């Protein structure tokens, strides 16, 4: 998904001398078993890993508001779970705290169906502490995907703020 690659590149550009080694990477074959993410996780053995992806923004007319996943314009989506992963609770709480401490618009994401590379990265080297930040997107997997510019900005800001405050001393063990 191109918008997540844009967010990753922009976050990398904005980072100024982080305290830890950070690897930025993009994967392929998510839709056929998370193969790229699993291979990447084995090669890098990250600790922790934060995946970037898009997620469903289904805040459209006629849709039951109680079944909304995310809303356009409500900020970055911090993933709690999808069908491939339950994110590390210490990591997603830290990402949420960073958002709150920096007044970054955010919403929580629970995706009832569909998975992401987060699961492949988490399982690649045992139980790698994994979290994810998603860009709320309408019309996923179509040529007319739509995102809100403020959500994309929030994803970039949140990723940068999270990485800038990672010092290697956070305990993500369960």
Language-model segments: which ranges?
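Short, well-ordered secondary-structure micro-motifs
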Residues: 34-38, 59-64, 119-120, 143-144
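Active-site-adjacent substrate-binding region
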Residues: 71-156, 162-174
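A glycine-rich helix N-cap at a beta->alpha junction
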Residues: 40-60
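Glycine-rich phosphate- or other oxyanion-binding loops that anchor nucleotides, phosphorylated ligands
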Residues: 29-36, 99
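Active-site loop ensemble at the mouth of alpha/beta enzyme cores that anchors a bound cofactor
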Residues: 46, 51, 63-76
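Acidic, glycine-rich active-site loops and adjacent beta-strand->loop/helix elements
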Residues: 26-32, 54-56, 137-139
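Alpha-helix C-terminal capping segments
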Residues: 10-16, 42-44, 122-127
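Alpha-helical metal-binding/catalytic segments enriched in His/Glu/Asp
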Residues: 1-32, 158-159
